[in-house]
């Protein structure tokens, strides 16, 4: 594996909200051997930004829009249906520029707009720091529905991201997708949760309200599965990692701690060797 491939894998595997830290580490590690290596990582940045559904605010707007392969126009330009605009996105700096008008037309335009109208309130209610997008794909034969929610808490040593992707075939009502959770906790350790849940369903009424209703039901079930999994881990595998201590259910009287056997062992540790 070449140096570029190795460093690219670091970029593509960066935890949520920590890409800048990864880049800083790469620069530090390659300062003497290859100080310009970051300039060669544009393909890795593009892959990361599109796969992670990175969000950006367009100039003059406070509303975040999603970067993904589903709303790519090629040559670094992307479009946003809700704002009827297209823009250039710099994958290295994660900045948007050159905003232009982009009016959605085509066979799925009405379905895309009705789905956008229905999914907005759902996302606002259930996700923090979230963005969503609905796009026509595959020669206007299907639509892609994308949701991303980010929660960054570096002061508490953790960051997290939820990603939902759904592909709807209006002709059959088939809805297929994946739900992904990525959480990184790094206080006095390094723990990362990565999940990928494939989902599928059939929409009897292919309209915005029906689509969002089914999405809500699938995501609720998955959230319940995750909660059960956390309880199982806490009571099972994680509990087994902890050193077992006897439970006396008695408060320690700290002013008398030396009278306890543990205190005696500590106090006389030197003479007992």
Swiss-Prot record:
GO terms for molecular function: actin filament binding. GO terms for cellular component: actin cortical patch; F-actin capping protein complex. Belongs to the F-actin-capping protein alpha subunit family. The gene is CAP1. One of its GO terms (biological process) is actin cytoskeleton organization. It is found in: Cytoplasm, Cytoskeleton. It comes from the Eukaryota. Heterodimer of an alpha and a beta subunit. It comes from Gibberella zeae (strain ATCC MYA-4620 / CBS 123657 / FGSC 9075 / NRRL 31084 / PH-1) (Wheat head blight fungus). Pfam families: F-actin_cap_A. Keywords: Actin capping, Actin-binding, Cytoplasm, Cytoskeleton. F-actin-capping proteins bind in a Ca(2+)-independent manner to the fast growing ends of actin filaments (barbed end) thereby blocking the exchange of subunits at these ends. Unlike other capping proteins (such as gelsolin and severin), these proteins do not sever actin filaments. This is F-actin-capping protein subunit alpha.
């Amino acid at each position: 594996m070449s140096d570029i491939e190795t460093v690219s894998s670091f970029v593509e595997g960066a935890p949520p909200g920590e890409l800048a830290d990864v880049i800083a580490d790469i620069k530090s590690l390659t300062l003497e051997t290859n100080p310009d290596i970051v300039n060669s990582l544009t393909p890795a940045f593009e892959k990361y930004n599109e796969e992670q559904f990175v969000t950006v605010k367009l100039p003059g707007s406070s509303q975040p829009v999603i970067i993904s392969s589903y709303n790519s126009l090629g040559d670094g330009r992307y479009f946003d249906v809700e704002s009827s605009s297209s823009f250039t996105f710099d994958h290295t700096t994660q900045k948007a520029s050159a905003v232009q008008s982009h009016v959605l037309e085509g066979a799925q335009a009405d379905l895309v707009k009705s789905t956008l109208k229905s999914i907005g309130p759902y996302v606002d209610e259930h996700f923090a720091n979230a963005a969503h997008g609905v796009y026509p794909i595959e020669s206007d034969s299907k639509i892609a529905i994308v949701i991303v929610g980010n929660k960054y808490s570096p002061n508490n040593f953790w960051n997290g991201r939820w990603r939902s992707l759904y592909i709807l075939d209006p002709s059959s009502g088939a809805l297929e997708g994946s739900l992904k959770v990525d959480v990184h906790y790094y206080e006095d350790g390094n723990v990362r949760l990565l999940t990928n849940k494939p989902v599928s369903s059939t929409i009897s009424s292919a309209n915005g309200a029906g689509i969002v209703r089914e999405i809500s039901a699938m995501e609720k079930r998955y959230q319940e599965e995750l909660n059960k999994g956390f309880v199982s881990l806490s009571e099972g595998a994680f509990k087994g990692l902890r050193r077992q201590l006897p439970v006396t259910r008695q408060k320690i009287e700290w002013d008398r701690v030396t009278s306890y056997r543990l205190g005696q062992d500590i106090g006389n540790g030197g003479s007992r060797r």
